[in-house]
Amino acid sequence: MAAAVAAAPGALGSLHAGGARLVAACSAWLCPGLRLPGSLAGRRAGPAIWAQGWVPAAGGPAPKRGYSSEMKTEDELRVRHLEEENRGIVVLGINRAYGKNSLSKNLIKMLSKAVDALKSDKKVRTIIIRSEVPGIFCAGADLKERAKMSSSEVGPFVSKIRAVINDIANLPVPTIAAIDGLALGGGLELALACDIRVAASSAKMGLVETKLAIIPGGGGTQRLPRAIGMSLAKELIFSARVLDGKEAKAVGLISHVLEQNQEGDAAYRKALDLAREFLPQGPVAMRVAKLAINQGMEVDLVTGLAIEEACYAQTIPTKDRLEGLLAFKEKRPPRYKGE
C-alpha cells in the first residue's frame, strides 16, 4: 500500500521549511510508518472569540483597538485539564484582561509552551480555546507593545505569532475555538487555526489589518479563503469588515452560533458539549481522521484518497479497533485506551 500511496499523483508547490518540519513531526507522531506521496512529505496540515456596542458589519467601522501591555504578566493563560466525565478535555483560557487578550510577547510565549506540552500528551482528547475575560476573545496584536518595536523587530515577532498559530493548527487532537466576544486580527487568526469555531451571536470577528496598512500575518490570508472561499475572503480582508456571529455563520466562518447567555459563555458551553461528543470515540481514529482531512484538503482527490487509505491502515492493527468490534458484539459501550 505504501508504494501505491507513494505513486499517487498530485504535485504541490514548495512550503516554508519550518512548517514542513513541523508537520512532518506531527505526522510521524500521529501515524508512525505512514508514508504520504513524495510531494506531500512534510506538507502543512491545513485547518484547517462578545462585546456589546461594537459596530456591525454593514458599513460600520471596525472597533478601535486601544489597549495596553502594562501590568502583571503572570496567569495570562490558564491551562485546565478537566476531570471526571470531562476527563481528556483541556481548556486554554486567555486571561489578559488589561490588554483585551491582545497577543503580547509574554502571551505568545505562554501559548507556545502550553501547545508544546499538549501536542505530546496522549491523555488529551480535545482542546478548547476560550477567553476568561468578559466581552473579549482576543483583540489581535498588542499595538502599544508593537509601537515600541523597531522595524527590525516586528518581522521576527510576527513570525513567532505565525509559528504558534501553526502549532495550534497542527495539534493532533480536535481543537475548538469558543468565541464569546471580540476576535480581531490575530484573534480571529487564532480561531481560524482551530478545527471548529463556535460563537455567540453578539461576537465580532474580522481581519482588520488593512486599516493599519498591513496584512494579516498569522495565517489569515491563507486560512480564511480555505474556510469561506477566495472571493469573500478577499472582500472581508480588503474592507477590514467586522462580522457578528450570525453573519459569520451565514458565510461559513463558524459552525454554530448561539444567543449569548447571562454568564457570557454561551459559545464555551457549546464547545464543551461538542468536546463531550468527541470523548467516546477512538483516540487513534480521531487523530488519523484529522490528519487525513487536513492533508487531503491540500491536494487533488486521487491523492487525497491515497492519504485516506494510508491513514485507515494505521487503525487496523490497534487494540481499540478490536475493542470496538467486541463492544458491538457484547452490546456495551467501548472502552478505548488509545492503543
Swiss-Prot record:
One of its GO terms (cellular component) is mitochondrion. Changing K105N: Abolishes RNA-binding. Its EC number is 4.2.1.18, 4.2.1.56. Keywords: Acetylation, Branched-chain amino acid catabolism, Disease variant, Lyase, Mitochondrion, RNA-binding, Transit peptide. The modification N6-succinyllysine is found at K100, K109, K113, K144, K148, K160, K204, K211, K329. It is linked to 3-methylglutaconic aciduria 1: An inborn error of leucine metabolism. It leads to an autosomal recessive syndrome with variable clinical phenotype, ranging from delayed speech development to severe psychomotor retardation, coma, failure to thrive, metabolic acidosis and dystonia. Catalyzes the fifth step in the leucine degradation pathway, the reversible hydration of 3-methylglutaconyl-CoA (3-MG-CoA) to 3-hydroxy-3-methylglutaryl-CoA (HMG-CoA). Can catalyze the reverse reaction but at a much lower rate in vitro. HMG-CoA is then quickly degraded by another enzyme (such as HMG-CoA lyase) to give acetyl-CoA and acetoacetate. This is Methylglutaconyl-CoA hydratase, mitochondrial.
